[in-house]
Amino acid sequence: MKTTILVVILGLTLLFALSAATELKDEERDCKGFQVKCKKDSECCSSYVCGRQWKWCVYPSPFGR
C-alpha cells in the first residue's frame, strides 16, 4: 500500500515536471501567435500581421491595408 502511494506521487511529480518543461519550450518562440499583443508586423508569425486598431497579431485582411 505504501509503495503504491509512493509510486503514484512519483508519477504525478514526473508528469508535472514534463508538462512544465513543455510549457517553457512554447514560450521560447521567436514570433507571436494569433491574438497576442504586438507593436509591429515583424513580431508576429509569418501568417499574421499586427492589427492597426488593437495591436494584436491577426490574419491579414483580404481587402488590403
Curated annotation (Swiss-Prot):
Q: List the disulfide bonds.
A: C31-C45, C38-C50, C44-C57
Localization annotation: Secreted
Q: Which residues form the propeptide?
A: 22-29
Expressed, tissue-wise, as follows:
Expressed by the venom gland.
The answer to whether UniProt assigns keyword tRNA processing to this entry is: no
Q: What range does the record give for the signal peptide?
A: 1-21
Q: Name one Pfam family in it.
A: Toxin_12
Molecular function per GO:
ion channel inhibitor activity; toxin activity
Q: Where are the transmembrane segments?
A: none
Q: Which GO terms describe its cellular component?
A: extracellular region
Q: Which UniProt keywords apply?
A: Disulfide bond, Ion channel impairing toxin, Knottin, Secreted, Signal, Toxin
What's its job? Probable ion channel inhibitor.
Query: What's noted about domains in the record?
Result: The presence of a 'disulfide through disulfide knot' structurally defines this protein as a knottin.
Which family does the record assign?
Belongs to the neurotoxin 10 (Hwtx-1) family. 32 (Jztx-16) subfamily.
What is the name of the protein in this document?
A: U11-theraphotoxin-Cg1b
